[in-house]
Amino acid sequence: MTAAVWTLLLAYLFGSVPAGVLVARTYGVDLRKVGSGNIGATNVLRALGWGPALVVAFFDVFKGGIAVLVARAFGLSDWMLGGVALMAVLGHNYSVFLRFRGGKGVATSFGTLLFLDPVLALWTFPIGLSVILLTRYVSAGSMTGGVAAFVLSLALGRPLWEVATVFLMALLIFWTHRENLKRLREGTERRLGERVEAR
């Protein structure tokens, strides 16, 4: 197998590592049965608090970044870098370790973007964060961040491979948040800081 194929597989496996599930398990909690059932940092925050949530967020961000670093070490093309970034996100969303279920891919998307294009990532982050702080809806901030990253990639004149990668990541974010969109419309979406009982 070529280096490109191996790197794509490694990126998927990196992304598949379910940090939220593993961290919650150390507290005797099955994260998939708590709150939203999501394996990401937001649900960890609801169930276990800020400390464990920050650990999960850090891991989910940097597993995407590690995938990009490995791809660069192999000297892969720009388009392959984009493919590796997407595979890491798909691994998080559809983890082989969780029977192809997983999270929403926001932190991992940010991590890949941070290592692909730090300037774009650091322009995008405060936009998404501002929406979260203003509304206390993490889902709204996540989707806004996805749109902002795509718009900024166009505005900043980024190359086609990067624009395409960011566009597909934004689409994935909206796809994984489709139930959140429904709850936002219905007014039943949980806000940041709302706790749930950890079982």
From Swiss-Prot:
Matching Pfam families: G3P_acyltransf
Lipid biosynthesis found in the keyword field: yes
UniProt keyword terms in alphabetical order: Cell inner membrane, Cell membrane, Lipid biosynthesis, Lipid metabolism, Membrane, Phospholipid biosynthesis, Phospholipid metabolism, Transferase, Transmembrane, Transmembrane helix
Subcellular compartments: Cell inner membrane
Any GO BP annotation: phospholipid biosynthetic process
Keyword Coiled coil: no
Record field: catalytic activity: an acyl phosphate + sn-glycerol 3-phosphate = a 1-acyl-sn-glycero-3-phosphate + phosphate
Gene Ontology CC terms: plasma membrane
Bilayer disposition of the protein: Multi-pass membrane protein
The enzyme's E.C. designation: 2.3.1.275
Molecular function per GO: acyl-phosphate glycerol-3-phosphate acyltransferase activity
Pathway it works in: Lipid metabolism; phospholipid metabolism
Transmembrane segments: 3-23, 50-70, 78-98, 113-133, 154-174
Function recorded in the entry: Catalyzes the transfer of an acyl group from acyl-phosphate (acyl-PO(4)) to glycerol-3-phosphate (G3P) to form lysophosphatidic acid (LPA). This enzyme utilizes acyl-phosphate as fatty acyl donor, but not acyl-CoA or acyl-ACP.
HAMAP family associated with the record: PlsY
Quaternary context: Probably interacts with PlsX.
Family: Belongs to the PlsY family.
Protein name as annotated: Glycerol-3-phosphate acyltransferase
Gene name of this polypeptide: plsY
